[in-house]
Design a protein with these regions (language model features):
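Juxtamembrane regions of bacterial inner-membrane/periplasmic proteins
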Residues: 1-294, 305-311, 316, 362, ...
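Soluble, non-transmembrane domains of envelope/secretory-pathway proteins that act on or interact
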Residues: 1-11, 19-23, 28, 228, ...
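Active-site SXXK
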Residues: 76-77, 81, 222, 281, ...
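Short, well-structured active-site flanking segments
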Residues: 85-94, 167-170, 230-232, 325, ...
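Conserved catalytic neighborhood of penicillin-recognizing serine enzymes
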Residues: 104-128, 245-260, 353-408, 454, ...
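Active-site loop and adjoining helix of the penicillin-binding protein/serine DD-peptidase-beta-lactamase fold
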Residues: 196-214, 265-277, 320-361, 365, ...
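A penicillin-recognizing enzyme superfamily signal
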Residues: 271-292, 300-302, 313, 320-328, ...
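Mid-domain, small-residue-enriched loop/turn segments at the edges of structured enzyme/sensor domains
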Residues: 370-373, 404-449, 456-457, 462
């Protein structure tokens, strides 16, 4: 074999080995980063509650092509990779031009990278060298084979760098514009195309002038390609550069738990929480905490009694306050007297007493344990109902002695609730349970009270819409329906807080069954209530367990409980106050040649609906005009049986439009309550 032939063979073998090595690298392009995206928790209607960073400290939100502005996608491809839909991952012509430029310069300085090659680089960054470029090209071909075009595009839009900790078009759109990228303005699209080319140098929050120049350059290129008019480009270029917004963190503690439990394959969790209700109660908690002193905190749990869906959960009065990062809904705190209703319920069920049974409120001792009432007085003979309504301690301890403290605790814990005794004294037979001698979480207390509200049937709380839709167990019987209903009937006649009318004088108002609790040393103030389909438990106290002299459940927690029910009542769907389903005949005869005219709902209206979503009766929209098409916030509505019925998904403001065949339209901005 001649020398030249040996050289050729050696060169060919080396080239083959190189190609094989590159091929292996392409086939093993790591997808781990793509599989790790930020878990996002939404409210029941899809409103953002909270997201978490991925392990490497990035906001990485998985992109959805079907929910990304298609015009933005077309413009991105036109400017960044015009042959995207036809090349195999590498654009040979662009790569050849870039290679020639790079060889001439002796280093990588020119582009030529397709979106797929950029994706390969994002998945595993390589040094900017010619061999690294070859690896990226080979991996791009492999990625195309593995993911397909739509998969590659979705992956690129998930990992594209947008400065700082932001990755992907969703994170950037939410951080800079405050909304999902489903609909983007010309200015927003241009900025999202410009930033990834130099993400740190073009960060709008740190380098607004550079971001503005880069956006203008993209707009100019769009004009040259005929993808936008010069006038529209000038208008977009004149818009201010946005600043970075803080991501929402509603229901921060509970949403954080749900996010951490999310599956890597399903990083989005739709919770049962109502975002508008959550926001109102967080504000109420902050106001209440401020009114009770700098060291005080507040917690609230709101449960839909029928489904056990947690509709709102407030963990503190604010994380900017002392101890504000402590989730008080999970902390073991003394329930005070708030477990007394269950003592009486078990006693009624077992025939040990009835609501009108006479009980002695007098001094008594149990192996050295001598309970006394909160007011340090005894009231003689009282009925069981009176003892419960006035939270008398001595009769409650007597009832617990008959029921048996161990049996009482076992019955409560059979629901999944956990009662923890801090330190049992030698002379304490467990009767202190009646007065809050064992700790319980606010979440478990809500579960127990929801069982009372559901005729004695216990079920765990529900946190996600997926759980709500799935088949659920029948639940467990905590107490008989008759006993549970008797206890609630008694509690409905309890003395209301100052400033509230007694139940007998509030005909027509929802009847609220409630009980308060105050722990030893005024450390915890608790109030729990059941009424109008809701179970609510509130707590106020110091996160560090400190004493708050005079802050009882009745004084510190009960007013808050009633305020929460006020919010729930104000939030409740009412009968529709505007109900014309079709245009009156006289109006229907009017000439419509002047364009559509909105008839129902009128502009500026506030409309009460019976419920939200598919179960709602809906609103029949009406307008004067011919061959109308209807839109709500830009989304088309379908016509059925000659009518267009709109079923709002959640309360808030909406823009309704009716458009005729000539493009003329009538609009109404309405508020749904």
């Amino acid at each position: 074999m001649t020398l030249s032939r040996r050289v050729l063979v050696g060169t060919g073998a080396g080239l083959a080995a190189g190609v094989a090595t590159v091929a292996v690298l392409a086939l093993t392009a790591p997808l781990g980063k793509l599989e790790r995206s930020s878990p996002v928790v939404l409210d029941r209607h899809g409103v953002w509650l909270r997201a978490l960073l991925v392990e490497d400290g990035r906001w990485r939100l998985r992109a959805d092509l079907d929910r990304t502005d298609p015009i933005f996608i077309r413009r991105l491809i036109a400017l960044e990779d015009s042959h995207f839909w036809i090349h195999p991952g590498v654009d040979p012509a662009a790569l050849a031009r870039a290679a020639a430029s790079d060889l001439k310069a002796g280093r990588v300085r020119s582009g030529g990278s397709t979106l797929t090659m950029q994706l390969a680089r994002r998945l595993e960054p390589q040094p900017r060298t010619l061999p690294a470029k070859a690896i990226e090209a080979a991996r791009a071909v492999g990625l195309e084979a593995r993911l397909g075009k739509r998969g590659v595009l979705a992956a690129y839009l998930t990992l594209a760098p947008y400065g700082g900790s932001l990755e992907g078009v969703r994170a950037a759109s939410l951080a800079y514009f405050g909304h999902e990228p489903s609909t983007l303005t010309n200015a927003e699209q241009a900025l999202l195309i410009a930033i990834p080319q130099a993400p740190e140098l073009r960060r709008p929050d740190r380098h607004p002038l550079a971001a503005k120049r880069a956006r203008a350059a993209v707009l100019h290129r769009l004009v040259l390609k005929g993808l936008i008019s010069a006038k529209a480009a000038r208008e977009a270029a004149a818009e201010p550069i946005p600043r970075r917004m803080v991501f929402p963190e509603r229901a921060w503690a509970a949403a954080g738990e749900l996010a951490r439990a999310a599956s890597p394959t399903q990083p989005t969790v739709v919770s049962t929480i109502e975002a508008p209700l959550q926001a109102r109660l967080e504000a109420l908690a902050a106001q209440t905490g401020a009114g009770q002193g700098e060291q005080s905190s507040v917690a609230i749990v709101v449960v839909d009694t029928a489904t056990r869906a947690v509709r709102a959960i407030v963990s503190s009065a604010g994380r900017d306050r002392p101890g504000g990062w402590v989730d008080a809904t999970r902390a073991l705190r003394s329930p005070g007297s708030s477990l007394k209703p269950f003592i009486y319920a078990f006693a009624f069920e077992q025939g040990l007493a009835a609501p009108e049974t006479k009980l002695a409120d007098a001094p008594v001792a149990y192996a050295g344990y001598e309970p006394e009432n909160f007011d340090r007085t005894f009231h003689g003979e009282v009925t069981a109902a009176q003892a419960l309504q006035n939270s008398l301690n001595v009769p409650a301890v007597a009832m617990l002695a008959k029921v048996g403290p161990e049996a009482f605790q076992a019955r409560l814990e059979s629901t999944g609730a956990r009662l923890v005794r801090p330190k049992a004294a030698a002379n304490d037979p467990g009767l202190a349970l009646a007065l809050g001698g064992e700790g319980v979480t606010l979440r478990d207390l809500a579960m127990l009270y929801a069982a009372l509200g559901d005729h004695g049937l216990a079920r765990p709380l529900t946190w996600t819409q997926l759980q709500l839709r799935s088949d659920r167990a029948e639940g467990s019987r905590l107490v008989s329906a008759e006993a549970a209903d008797q206890v609630l009937s008694i509690l409905r006649e309890s003395p209301p807080p100052p400033g509230r009318a007694p139940p007998a004088l509030s005909a027509g108002a929802p009847k609220l069954a409630f009980k308060t609790g105050t722990s030893y040393g005024f450390r915890d103030a608790v109030a729990a209530g059941v009424g109008d389909g809701w179970t609510v438990v509130v707590w106020t106290g110091r996160p560090d367990g400190g004493v708050r002299p005079g802050m009882t459940g009745r004084e510190a927690a009960l007013p808050l409980l009633f305020q929460v029910f006020d919010v729930l009542e104000a939030n409740a769907p009412q009968a529709q106050t505007l109900t014309p389903q079709v245009a009156p005949p006289a109006l229907a005869q009017l000439d419509s040649r002047g364009g559509p005219q909105m008839l129902f709902p009128p502009d500026g209206a506030s409309v009460m609906v019976d419920s939200y979503g598919p179960q709602s009766r809906g609103l029949a929209l009406a307008a004067r005009g011919d061959r109308l098409r209807w839109y709500v916030d830009g989304q088309p509505l379908a016509e059925a049986d000659g009518q267009v019925v709109w079923r709002p998904e959640y309360p808030g403001f909406y823009r309704i439009a009716a458009v005729d065949d000539h493009g003329r339209h009538a609009t109404a901005r309405v508020r749904i309550k």
